[in-house]
Amino acid sequence: MVKESDILVVGGGHAGIEASLIAAKMGAKTHLITMLIDTIGLASCNPAIGGLGKGHLTKEVDVLGGAMGIITDNSGLQYRVLNASKGPAVRGTRAQIDMDTYRIFARNLVLNTPNLSVSQEMTESLIIENDEVVGVTTNINNTYRAKKVIITTGTFLKGVVHIGEHQNQNGRFGENASNSLALNLRELGFKVERLKTGTCPRVAGKSINFEGLEEHFGDTNPPYFSYKTKNFNPTQLSCFITYTNPTTHQIIRDNFHRAPLFSGQIEGIGPRYCPSIEDKINRFSEKERHQLFLEPQTIHKSEYYINGLSTSLPLDVQEETIHSIKGLENALITRYGYAIEYDFIQPTELTHTLETKKIKGLYLAGQINGTTGYEEAAAQGLMAGINAVLALKNQAPFILKRNEAYIGVLIDDLVTKGTNEPYRMFTSRAEYRLLLREDNTLFRLGEHAYHLGLMEKDFYKELKKDKQEIQENLKRLKECVLTPSKEVLKRLSELDENPINDKINGVDLLARDSFSLEKMRSFFSFLAPLSERVLEQIKIECKYNIYIEKQHENIAKMDSMLKVSIPKDFVFKGIPGLSLEAVEKLEKFRPKSLFEASEISGITPANLDVLHLYIHLRKNS
């Protein structure tokens, strides 16, 4: 049977959900093919969304019309702001989720969305005509023709599950791997490599002894992810903290020879920032204990996820290991930990739209691009979906810059640098992180969302008004010069604020940590009518004013630099500071400007600085 659609999405994980929903929302006739409809939106690993850097991604996805934020706000069990004591740039919202509620909400959203159809089958191969994808074939002899295809296969491409010496061809424990499609992608000439990730054991809640364990509460004023969420009053369940101990470590050390990670059984590289417990004990042998979090998987608390105990050790070793841990002495293991090895395609094979360079109309998103994490997958799925629709309409692509969004950092890192290990987002990856805070996501991306047709006009008008109020009042505060007059000193004293000794403008005064929103309203009467959302932005902009201005200067400098032309006869070879790889790529592609050079995978900002310097020296010589 032959079926037709505008856009075809392969895979119903977190990338596939966002890709299919956004494509349908933007008016494209979309079809999603997934192996199991019941596992759409399944959280295969930890039952949580958000975190450091990841919370930023989730909120950006939400503002740009994505679903992850609203699904999380409707399925969370505990909400916290991580790094709450630090500056706003590095804070991250995180939620424990009810895995069942999240999955059901996501599945129903997909099934009930207009313009979007779903079928349960396995994609086996791509149909390519004149280096352009035109559809796929499936395991039940269906043929789907489409103008654009987005592949979001997660860990299913030639997936192999490892538990001790036992191996099985699975894309997730108990589910078939996608071997035919994996072979097809290799045959098409993509640069395919292997990665590895793992998951932690789960134990029955009734078998845990919580007495003596440290209880970990949610925030009193719980944060939420979606700007559309109203009247937020979620259930807040506790997590619990326990630790490994020297006995635990010795059990694991005694079985290193049986660990697939060390025996040579696993060849793929695992996530650097989420190592297995056997890897942690091997690498940090001096540590006497490692922290573990017991996290409820659902509101029923029937199963708990042991966060921090990712492992692929044999079953008997997992049993012995878990029973050596305080609170888990009599724990009943409901699901064992395992490692999974899978194919991914080097993301340098992609453009910034996530379309492959090799095959027109083919987009890749999620773990197939070498990333790890639900949020990273969702962000890529969203961007692939948006750009597939824009290409369908012959409109300009939507590419976020590194100074606009963490999504921009994520995609730029992937397509220009590639990766040899599972890539996850951190705030430290963003050089402009003071500008890319969670709290200003709406102000950063609202205009983009509106022009893409992904934000309602009335809300955008309100947002635009808020943005204007922020800019106008910051300008007014900068122009407002205060002197240590009797009146000013008296008003400061009444607010329990330290006196000023010299002239100071309003921005510098509000940079004080002690100057609360209430004090701002009281001291500067023109701020009194402003909403809390606007006041918070003004406060943050005042506090980090010097650094924010510096980052804006750096952006302007970079934008100016990228406009610099490269002479036709410019010789790249022999320039100190350029690696052999950079020279080879520059000689091969002969970019006409530094902007074109910046688009070449493997060319770093440091390379661009060196080129800029030597172009300048040549012009002046």
Swiss-Prot record:
Residues where NAD(+) binds: 270-284
Cofactor: FAD
Gene Ontology terms, MF aspect: flavin adenine dinucleotide binding
Residues engaged in binding FAD: G11, G12, G13, H14, A15, G16
Keywords, alphabetical: Cytoplasm, FAD, Flavoprotein, NAD, tRNA processing
Gene Ontology CC annotation, any one: cytosol
Gene3D superfamilies from the UniProt entry: FAD/NAD(P)-binding domain (3.50.50.60), GidA associated domain, C-terminal subdomain (1.10.150.570), tRNA uridine 5-carboxymethylaminomethyl modification enzyme MnmG/GidA (1.10.10.1800)
InterPro entries, per database record: FAD/NAD-bd_sf, GIDA_C_N, MnmG, MnmG-rel, MnmG-rel_CS, MnmG_C, MnmG_C_subdom, MnmG_C_subdom_sf
Principal location listed in the UniProt entry: cytoplasm
Biological process according to GO: tRNA methylation; tRNA wobble uridine modification
Source taxon at top rank: Bacteria
Subcellular location: Cytoplasm
HAMAP family: MnmG_GidA (MF_00129)
Protein function: NAD-binding protein involved in the addition of a carboxymethylaminomethyl (cmnm) group at the wobble position (U34) of certain tRNAs, forming tRNA-cmnm(5)s(2)U34.
Family annotation (NCBIfam families): mnmG_gidA
Subunit architecture: Homodimer. Heterotetramer of two MnmE and two MnmG subunits.
Family listed: Belongs to the MnmG family.
Identification of the protein by name: tRNA uridine 5-carboxymethylaminomethyl modification enzyme MnmG
Species of provenance: Helicobacter acinonychis (strain Sheeba)
The gene coding this protein: mnmG
